[in-house]
Amino acid sequence: MNILYVTSEAVPFCKTGGLADVAGSLPQALAANGDRVSAILPLYERVKDKWGEQLHFEKWTFVRLAWRSVYCGLFSLERDGVTWYFVDNETYFRRSELYGYYDDGERFGFFSRAVTELLKSLPQKPDVVHCNDWQSALVPIYIRDEAVRDDFYKGIRTVITVHNIEYQGRYGSRTVEDLFGLDHGWFDGGTIEFGGDVNLLKGAIVTADAVTAVSPTYAQELKYAYFAHGLENVMSMNARKLHGVLNGIDMQRYDPSRDKSLAAAYSPDDLAGKKKDKAALQRVLGLQERPDTPILAMVTRLVSHKGLDLVCETLDAFMGKDVQFVVLGKGDAKYETFFEYAKQRYGGRMAVYLGYSEQLAMQIYAGADLFLMPSKSEPCGLSQMIAMRYGAVPIVRETGGLKDTVHAYEAWNGQGNGFTFANYNAGDMCHVICEAIDLYHDNKGAYAVLQQRGMTADFSWTRSAQEYRNIYESICR
């Protein structure tokens, strides 16, 4: 099967969020199963600066974008069994950031149009074009539109994956013809119209042959208003083609036995190195060097939907326990200020790093005993899987992928691999945090079992890739 994976970011080329991790791993896992896989993304400034010398020039052409004819270059790179293509246009992509510009609609409209037209330039016609989020949501629409008058596009199946439905690509109705070059019937007929605006993600959900969400629970949550940001009816009406596929993590990249950023390596069979990593983390962050005190950690964006209001409300309560608390992240000023003041109050028992450091993040995963993710919503979440891989027992709210990957510890039968709470309230969260701290102190054997279950769990992309392969086969029949 020939598969083209369309994304706006991918590790190791460029990253702003979890989409990049998925896009950097899933194509490789699909290729390992024997499929012919290629992936395509914009040639951003940071990609050209770092990878430019390794890129092979394929061709240049002009792309039709409404009334404009726009230059488009195509470059390629072979990596890990996947052919990576890069769409070049310096007007749109020679910028310091990936997103956040006034003309993002035009930028990714061009990208989607370029992908659609460049399908004819690929060595083999793809059977499936797999798109991600609003930035490539126009591709299924363009393919459906072109298939009416060009036989080449007939038979190409499309998939759209929703990583975070909050971001939908909404623009004024005048963009239909003037910016995206579509007949206004796409808007008037309701395919891309929502609330009087153009909604690109809605259009892809309606048009694509299959819709996937990044975890089974998130796929179900998207049918409800609390999670769907207005698109709950659209998701419910398209439920027959909606699938929840849990993301994986790169098990080789996230491996404490070979992670060079750690003070000491360790494995599920030999945890001596983790004790050294804990001591090293305490020294680096200025914490009291106490091996028997558990470290509770968060590596997160400091924004409300990550559950920070619950943490602020209960901090004094759970810090009344024998525990150390570490926070790595940046975000809203009110949370940054709160944690800065809290760090001063708790001295050597609390550390806060406002910003992001990949190396420090890995050192925190390795040094932590408990890992907190009290999110209001979490489509999938990768941090809880990385934490478990590094031997930090997770404490999570039961939502999205957190519910699918972390199962509550049951004292009466010893089942589970972490601690969970269902209701979004401070009391429930504080209760399970205290329960986890008490288990660490009072029942080392039970804690060690939870730790081992997390470290030995299979969070690889192999299973996820096979699920996607099954979806591709079902829509190509």
Features from the language model and the residues they span:
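Catalytic cores of nucleotide-sugar-dependent glycosyltransferases that transfer UDP/GDP/TDP-activated
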Residues: M1-R477
